[in-house]
Amino acid sequence: MAYRLTLRRDAIRWLRAQRAQLYVGMLMQARAQQFYLSFITSSDTAREQMREVFAETDTRLPPLERARLGASGSVFASPKVRGLYDLLMAEAWPVLLYPGRFRSDEARMRVLARTAGILGELEAAVRRELGADRMTLKTGPDGNNTG
């Protein structure tokens, strides 16, 4: 009986570790996508000024890695997190296909606000599921972690 309980605890611990790693990857990709949307919907002048900096700081995954992330999300992510992530990518898709249609101030602000809202919901869902808000770090008087 104790052996089975230990196996179950280990399986739960393993699943949590997989999920935490996956969620970090999903959040990184979602934030990178949001940054890219902001770049491609900018005016021609702004894009030209940002091009070099963007090329150095673009953290979007290559296609194969994105596919792996999506497959892992299908297996390990909760329906809520997977749904929010997929919604963010679906909102971004038309912008990626036709960025010129989203370069007016109104269209740009609308799509960036929508995707920022979804990203905020995604981050909140991940924090809830991982219990990140329940974790407290004890700090000493100098602000360093003491344990």
Question: Language-model features: where?
Answer:
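Conserved non-transmembrane functional hotspots
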Residues: 2-147
